[in-house]
A protein has these predicted regions:
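Short aromatic-rich membrane-water interface segments that cap or initiate transmembrane helices
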Residues: 29-31, 87-99, 161-175, 285-290, ...
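Alpha-helical transmembrane segments of multi-pass inner-membrane proteins
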Residues: 11-26, 42-53, 74, 78-81, ...
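Transmembrane signal-anchor hairpin modules in multi-pass inner-membrane enzymes, especially those
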Residues: 1-95, 101-131, 191-200, 243-246, ...
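Transmembrane alpha-helices of multi-pass inner-membrane enzymes
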Residues: 228-230, 379-431
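A membrane-periplasm/extracellular boundary helix in multi-pass inner-membrane enzymes
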Residues: 239-285, 433-452
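TM-adjacent membrane-interface loops and short helices in multi-pass inner/ER membrane proteins
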Residues: 173, 295-339, 353-360
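TPR repeat positional signature
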Residues: 487-490, 528
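Hydrophobic transmembrane alpha-helices and their immediate junctions
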Residues: 355-383, 547
Length: 579
């Protein structure tokens, strides 16, 4: 890069904070895509960091290996709609491909920084960013835990309807919160290992992080720290030097602290809050089997893969198959919502992208990890393995990599291997300028569209405004593939069967067309009922009956809601099915 090293390093740290701290602090969660603004912030941070690296570098840019699987998967997702006829919303393939393109930009940026200033500098800067972010999230989590969110107005995101599961920072999910705090804890350990923090600061912070992980009530943290113990223990027994011993002891200390807080949590709980609704990860392990519902979804994903082994059923196509296959599992736990993801990265990829997509990802990750370790394991590579292990083990039980802020983290970790290639900066500038401008344009225009979708999500009362907004949404569904799904998700609110405002705007066949289009992609319980009602009114009685029966089998917890929706005498036969 340029000669002004101090300026470069300061901007790089700011860039990492913009990437790993600011998006995660987002407290705005609006339908039709609650994490939109957090993910958009990640995208802008990546674009800014890549542009800075590209135009501050004097000579060479480094290309890490992880760029290859990212590029191949992006290409395959773009080609999949041409190969498979059953992809209802190809724009979602293109959006994911654009996200992977941004990840390529990020990987190149991280590799170039690491190759310029060294792995230790890169990981130190990353650890500072993750620690800052984790501390801020724990403060938010503590406010949620103590029930004092009312003092902060809308600044703190809070779900008052779930008093035992709302300790999730600004992630909205406790396992995502614990995942991020685990990254921060490993960053804290690395900074102390490198003597960047004093013992007076390290140990109180370690205890605070352990407490925060405990009140999140995530069971996955035990897996994360068990994996970290295995990695650091193997490193110590292979090296048997002071550095490896110190790292192993620190991770063991963190693990013991976590178990201590988990075990004594019922006593600690009384110090901070008066309510008796509490749980911890250890308590949840003792009281729940935990994987029963996920196991059914894993079985479904495997069945989908067996039916579509090469190309997969189609990107984002699992949700439909999950509902259609549900009758095969009569003893499954009750579903309170639609599973759009089977909660396992490998099975999800096998089901939706087949051996081609899954092979690209699995081989890419394994070989990237191998490249991190193939010369000689170091403290830095072990810390990176701990962070990677956290993300991958979480991905075997949920879907964190479907969020840009976690995907960006994994790409960052994997991009710290030895560069696969080094190219002249002028060549990359020529190649990247148009994609950068195109991404920026799509991000600006997409933000405007999303803001409009949020404003239009709740239907207005007057017919003129209702018609205007519905026509806007309909136009996006019909002509903007990148936003068609989110627009039809919003338009669904405007299609209310037997409503005068809807009937004045759309004929029954038109109502059916858009309801069916959404329902064949993401069969939500209320949308299935709506399609059944429209089928009935159009004279397709057998289809209506079949749809209600499937709805009842897949979502029995909503039986009372179905009865309320179908109580009109004209749907008497459908109503009888849910009595």
């Amino acid at each position: 890069m340029s000669e002004t090293t101090t300026f470069n390093k300061s901007f790089i740290l700011i860039g990492l904070i913009a990437l790993f701290v600011i998006p995660e602090l987002n407290n705005v969660h609006y339908d039709p895509q609650p994490q939109f603004w957090a993910e958009m912030t990640v995208a802008w941070a990546i674009l800014g960091l890549f542009s800075f690296i590209l135009w501050r570098s004097r000579e060479r840019i480094c290309i890490p290996f992880v760029v290859l699987p990212l590029g191949l998967l992006a290409l395959y997702l773009c080609l999949q709609p041409l190969i498979l006829a059953n992809i209802d919303f190809p724009g979602l393939n293109y959006v994911s491909a654009l996200e992977l393109l941004l990840c390529i930009f990020l990987a190149i940026s991280i590799s170039t920084i690491k190759n310029t200033y060294g792995l230790r500098y890169m990981l130190t800067s990353l650890s500072y960013a993750l620690l800052i972010g984790a501390i801020l999230q724990t403060l938010i989590g503590f406010i949620q835990y103590t029930g004092t969110t009312s003092y902060f107005g809308d600044m703190i995101f809070y779900d008052s309807s779930h008093p035992t599961t709302n300790i999730f920072g600004h992630f909205g999910q406790r396992n995502h919160y614990a995942h991020y705090l685990s990254w921060g804890t490993f960053g804290l350990i690395y900074l102390y290992q490198q003597r960047r923090l004093s013992a007076k600061l390290f140990y109180p912070l370690l205890l605070w992080m352990s407490f925060s992980l405990t009140i999140s009530a995530s069971r996955s943290v035990f897996i994360y720290f068990a994996i970290a113990l295995i990695f650091s223990g193997s490193f110590y027994f292979n090296k048997r030097n002071h550095e490896s011993k110190r790292l192993f002891c620190l991770i063991a200390c963190a693990t013991i602290a976590l178990f201590a807080f988990e075990y004594f949590y019922p006593l600690i709980h009384k110090l901070f809050t008066a309510h008796n609704n509490f749980s911890s990860g250890l308590g949840r392990i003792d009281s729940e089997s935990g994987t029963g519902r996920r196991g059914v979804e894993w079985d479904k994903a495997w069945l989908v893969f067996k039916s579509y082994p090469i190309f997969g059923y189609g990107w984002n196509g699992y949700a439909k198959q999950s509902v259609l296959l549900h009758p095969l599992f009569p003893n499954a736990a009750l579903n309170s919502g639609l599973f759009t993801n089977c909660h396992n990265l490998i099975l999800q990829l096998l089901a939706e992208t087949g051996l081609i997509g899954a092979g690209i990802v699995i081989f890419g990750i394994i070989y990237a990890i191998y490249r991190l370790l193939r010369r000689s394991a170091s403290v830095e590579s072990v810390i990176l393995l701990c962070m990677i292990g956290t993300t991958l083990s979480h991905s075997l039980n949920e879907y964190p990599l479907w969020y840009m802020y976690f995907l960006a983290g994994l790409v960052t970790f994997l991009a710290m291997d030895k560069p696969l290639a080094i190219i002249g900066v002028n060549k990359l500038r020529a190649l990247a300028t148009i994609p950068i401008i195109a991404c920026a344009y799509l991000m600006v225009s997409g933000s405007i569209i999303f803001d409009t979708l949020v404003n239009y999500y709740d239907t207005p009362d007057d017919q003129a405004t209702f018609t205007k907004q519905a026509k806007y949404l309909q136009n996006i569904v019909d002509h903007n593939p990148l936003w068609a799904y989110f627009a039809i998700y919003t338009l669904d609110n405007y299609i209310n069967v037997d409503s005068d405002t809807t009937n004045k705007l759309y004929s029954l066949p038109t109502q059916y067309y858009y309801t069916h289009k959404l329902n064949t992609f993401h069969p939500y319980p209320d949308t299935m009922t709506k399609e059944a009602m429209l089928d009935w009114k159009l004279g397709n009685h057998d289809a209506a009956i079949a749809m209600v029966k499937l709805d009842l089998i897949a979502f029995p917890v909503y039986k009372s809601s179905f009865k309320d929706t179908l109580k009109d005498p004209q749907y008497k036969e459908l109503y009888q099915l849910v009595k």
